[in-house]
């Protein structure tokens, strides 16, 4: 079952965003995005009055158990951030078996271009999060939970020069040279387990609730931007399924209860409403985004330590990459790769970037009334 929604162009459906955009350009028809709006609306229509009655930690436990009961093999894509860390702690604290933790860390190259430091908070220092945040967690797990397989995937230690025009279509989301690699990599045990006929859940920490305030009401909604991280990595493996832990149509109450937690906090702290006010918010306001991120983490997770090192979220930097990729873009190691990338990107950018930065959103779901 597809758990990440789909795009439609005319009478054709796509799980791949780039393929949909390409078809839209060729056929001159609009792209529509479907992400289970009927499921979330149906839940709210039947259960609006019960929001807030169940603790979020209990919902996280139920979600983890549901995944365990329905799959043979569970893989957690672990970034060390609050979303994936909360999933990890949910499995551990409730003694629900997790088969594998999958981490992307290109140590064969990264070790040459940076030294770990907690003094740089810009997204270009994303590499330090492995040394300062991820590795300590994995080292502890090796001792406390040796039954969990830990896979550290060196995503650049492969044939990264094998870029063809088709590569862009298959990537699912046009971001830049290094996302092109990241989005197509996955844990190799997926191939092994799939060939054995096993059902595999590829679990992603997607995502924190999106909130908007308008006309004295608080709404939540969904965006395809985060969902595309799950992408189309293992499209040929029918027994592998991308599972969004939080934004799941199988348990719509998780995302809606998270949104309700923010709504209740805004009721008690009305000065914060301006952060979400549709009429006053500015696009690409990084300061506002960071405030909301920290506020949300505090309200929906009790497993996160804010003293942990974290860099800023990456922003658009150039056609080749985001701010997290600054080191890669200037390093000799990738000169040849970028030449190959640019050669193929030149033909694709004119097609896909007819809709630059295009993000699709669902309709809004009303969480509650708030007279401010």
Task: Give, region by region, the residue ranges found by the protein language model.
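Nucleotide-activated chemistry modules centered on ATP-dependent adenylation/adenylyltransferase
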Residues: 1-74, 90, 96-372
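Hydrophobic positions on the alpha1 helix immediately C-terminal to the Walker A/P-loop
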Residues: 86-87
């Amino acid at each position: 079952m597809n758990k990440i929604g789909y795009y439609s162009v005319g009478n054709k459906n796509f799980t791949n965003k780039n393929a949909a955009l390409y078809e839209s350009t060729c056929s001159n028809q609009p792209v529509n995005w479907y992400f289970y709006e009927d499921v979330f609306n149906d839940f709210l229509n039947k259960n609006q009055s019960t929001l807030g009655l169940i603790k979020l930690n209990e919902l996280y436990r139920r979600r983890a158990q549901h995944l365990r009961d329905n799959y043979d093999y569970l893989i957690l894509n672990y970034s060390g951030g609050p979303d994936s860390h909360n999933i990890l702690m949910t499995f551990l604290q409730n003694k629900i078996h997790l088969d594998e933790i999958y981490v992307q860390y290109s140590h064969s190259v990264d070790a040459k271009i940076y030294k770990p430091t907690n003094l740089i908070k810009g997204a270009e220092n994303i590499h330090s999060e492995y040394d300062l945040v991820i590795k300590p967690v994995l080292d502890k797990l090796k001792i406390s939970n040796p039954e969990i397989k830990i896979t550290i995937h060196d995503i650049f230690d492969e044939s990264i020069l094998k870029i063809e025009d088709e590569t862009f279509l298959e990537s699912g989301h046009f971001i830049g040279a290094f996302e092109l690699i990241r989005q197509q990599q996955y844990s190799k045990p997926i191939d092994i387990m799939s060939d054995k006929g096993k059902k595999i859940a590829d679990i992603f920490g997607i995502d924190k609730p999106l909130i908007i305030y308008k006309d004295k009401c608080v709404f939540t909604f969904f965006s395809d931007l985060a969902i595309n991280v799950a992408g189309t990595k293992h499209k040929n493996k029918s027994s592998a399924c991308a599972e969004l832990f939080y934004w799941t149509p199988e348990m719509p109450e998780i995302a809606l209860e998270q949104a309700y937690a923010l709504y209740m906090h805004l009721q008690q702290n009305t000065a914060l409403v301006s952060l979400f006010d549709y009429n006053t918010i500015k696009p690409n306001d990084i300061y506002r985004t960071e405030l909301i991120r920290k506020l949300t983490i505090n309200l929906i997770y009790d497993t996160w330590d804010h003293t942990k090192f974290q860099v800023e979220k990456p922003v658009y930097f150039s056609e080749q990459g985001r701010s997290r990729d600054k080191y890669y873009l200037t390093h000799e190691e990738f000169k040849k790769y970028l030449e190959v990338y640019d050669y193929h990107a030149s033909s694709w950018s004119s097609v896909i970037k007819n809709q630059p930065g295009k993000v699709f959103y669902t309709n809004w779901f009303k969480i509650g009334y708030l007279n401010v």
